[in-house]
Structures are given as C-alpha cells and as structure tokens.
Amino acid sequence: MKRLIIIILVFMGFSAKAQTAKVAAAADMKYLMPELVANYKAKHPNATIDVSFGSSGLFYQQISNGAAFDIYFSADISYPQKLKEQGFVNGNVTTYAFGSLVLYSTSIDVSKGINVLNDEAVKKIAIANPQHAPYGKRAEECLKYYKIYDSVKSKLVLGDNITQTAQYTVTGNADVGIIALALALAPEMKSKGKYILLDTKSYNPVEQGCVLIKSWQVNPEASRFLKFVLSKECKPLFEKYGFIVP
C-alpha cells in the first residue's frame, strides 16, 4: 500500500510539472509575451506559463550550463542554432519574427535622424550591451554604418538587455536610446517619448529564433504553447508590436 501511494505521488508530481512551461524570452518580448500567455490561458486555463525575460546571450550561457527552461525565444537566431549544434535542443530551430531598431527619446528631437547623436545636447546614448544582447550588436553596427561610432563612443551607456536600455532612456539616465521597435510601441513608452525607425540597411537582420530545450522528461505543455505562439492566430499580436512575421 505504501509503495502504491509513493507511485501515485510521483505520478502526480510528473503531471503537475507537465502543466508548467518554463520560458526564457528575449527582453524585446516584454510587452508581447504577456498577451500571448493570456490568450493561451484563455484556451488552456489550467496551464502555467512561467516566463523569464532577459538578454538572449545570457540565456544562451545559462541553458548551456543546464538552466531548466523548456522554451527559448532568442532575439538572435544564432544562439538557439548553437544550442542545437551542442545537443541541447528538441526538434528544429524556427524563425518566429524579425525585429527592428529605432532611435527613441523623451527630450531630444530624434526626427533629425541618427546624426542628432553628435549634438552637444546629447550627453548619454543608451544601447544594449553588444557582448551578449542582439539589439546592442545591431546598434553598434548601425553607428559604424553611419560612421559616427568613434565620435559617440564615449557617450554610450550599456544596458544588460534591451528592456533596461529602454528604461535608461525613459528615466532620463540617457538622452537618447537605440532600442527595439517592440518596446517603443508599448503604450507606456509611446506616451513618454518619440521614435524614428532606423534604416534596416544599416544593420544586420534581427532574425529571432525559438526552440524546445531537451529535458529528461517530455513537457507537452511547452510543446503546445510553442505551437500556439507560432500559429497564425498570434501573428496580429506580433505585428501590434512591430515584429515582422515570416
């Protein structure tokens, strides 16, 4: 009898875990992901989707070191591709969207274009850390494309991820930020500042990829949630935040 109880408890533990999907999401999904989760839970009220937001590069390092995530949404598809090569992935890497860069400010007239960054009024420019944040790499590429990187390098303030970079700009810790369109379109950002799109020819595509992470136990909830996010039903939500869906 005691053995039967133990077996039942173990089974219940497995069932409970199967109802929870742990998601590592790129920081540019800060406003999009909660809407995706809400729509999914409307169809699957018993599901639990546990989302962590952060830098795609740092998530890559964590997953490589055994972090317990079920799904990984990366703002740079190269990171999930590396995980697949290293044997951490179930199935294929899927491109779920392309992101865009904008110049954003609450105090500077960004309609003047990228060269406004050279103005004396601009003391600090926020970008995400290029070492591990995809939007930071693209921001650096953009500055170099327009040949102003050297002249503004001393003004750069680095955020750990693109959300922190946006916050630097909104809170006045930076005069201008090069951030994701997906963040600039959020109501709380739109109400406080203005932005202009940066020419996509000035930086490499922000191709974003997602994968299911291998685990000792198959998680059907994670598979269902990922399938839902990639469905046509979710395309309007992605487009609401400026993502280009392939």
Predicted region positions:
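Sec-dependent N-terminal signal peptides
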Residues: 4-14
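Exported/periplasmic ABC-transporter solute-binding proteins
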Residues: 19-43, 48, 57, 61-65, ...
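Active-site acidic carboxylates
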Residues: 94
